[in-house]
Amino acid sequence: LNTDAVVTLNDVKVHYPVKEGALQRVTGHVKAVDGVDLSIARGKTLGLVGESGCGKTTLGRVIAALVAPTGGDIWMDLSAQQQLDVNRLRDLSESEMSTTDRDLWKQLTLNNRLGSMSKEKQRQFRRNCQVVFQDAFSSLNPRQLVRDIVGRPLRVHEQLSGEELDRRVIELLEKVGLGAEHLLRFPHQFSGGQRQRISIARALALNPEFVILDEPTSALDVSVQAQILNLLVELQAEMGLTYLFITHDLGVVQHMADDIAVMYLGQIVEYGPTDQVFDNPLHPYSRVLRDSNPTLEGERNRDWELSGTVPNPIDPPHGCRLHPRCPVAAAACGWSVSDALSRTEENSPVLFETIKTIERVDDFNAQVAFDNEDGARAFVDQLTNSSMNNAMPIPPTVSGSSVTLAFNEVKDASLEQIQKDRWSSCIRSQENGLLPELVKTPQVNEKEGQ
């Protein structure tokens, strides 16, 4: 780390409890954000991309202190040296710290850690971090005039009123391409693009350093999107703003962002400079997202495609979380008993219905009993012809109407540096330094032969 960071995240988690039954017992947790490490450099734009439901909006709300994390730390305004100090001290127990270290840690937590700051520091954070939401119409009070909407932060934090307040509001409106004639109108009297400009004006009212943009253009027409994006670029250059730009549109990120963080199933799977991630993705998910984005030359090669559906965030896959859907998944990527069962349920629902019992030893070993021996043999044939076959040190064996499963136990994939300024959680990229080539082989149709 060689630059100051507006925001630094260490192992941030947001887990929502799942409650069932009359007594509402907790039976599991939805891992919306699961162990995110991230740093946003001052004056830069970080693009946070991923499919709907990957956790990117939740992560943005956590950074804005609108949602409390269930684990990890969020640090504000750390210098490069302070980031090094935090990384060194955060895993030490108090007994392992020297007196100097303890004093430094106390100072860092009181001044820079969200949740431990003094009230004055929290108030300062509220001023310096603002959010522009996706749906401008629902984020603007329909009963208030533009003057009241944009002027509220000025009344609360700077205690302005009267002509001075109106003058500041008009200045903000003019900054975003509106004017005094819009001061006494309600939100419903504006177009979608104009409402988003009002949201931006409100976010800029207190001269923040950091703005979180949560899909600010996704609800707008393409021509209006371009106007808003150009406005955001101009404002950043004029005011020295730092942006976290959350979107599912890679074309927008390519235009806006200095760096990209790709998010899948609650985790960051790739991070790096925008041009490098587009030119040479180091994670299969990034490659699929990039290739699905149309260009002026037409669509890219679509050989890289994901299979199946997004796994359950209550029980995410072991190893690399993409491996059940990945076109280049290998034995080391983290197959488990749950993968074998979910693959069968998805591709052979009739066969899945013949399963009588499942006796799990652990996540990687189990005994699966079927109604008859034919079902057990069909299950083994399906596993043998699938990409998870090489992940089993002992081939699945049939004993009567039961099948014994044994997979290699693997640890969960983590984000690791692969190249200069490039990080990826792809296990195969970590082994080779590059994304593996896609080898197209004739695929066995698992639905046939049921």
Where are these regions (language model features)?
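Charged, flexible cofactor/metal-binding loops and thiol motifs
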Residues: 19-24, 102-107, 111, 274-425, ...
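P-loop NTP-binding/switch modules centered on Walker-like glycine-rich loops
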Residues: 65, 216, 220, 224-302
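Conserved ABC transporter NBD signature motif
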Residues: 72-86, 91, 99-112
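Conserved ABC ATPase "signature" region
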Residues: 163-181, 290
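Conserved ABC ATPase signature
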Residues: 186-190, 194
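Conserved catalytic motifs of ABC-family nucleotide-binding domains
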Residues: 207
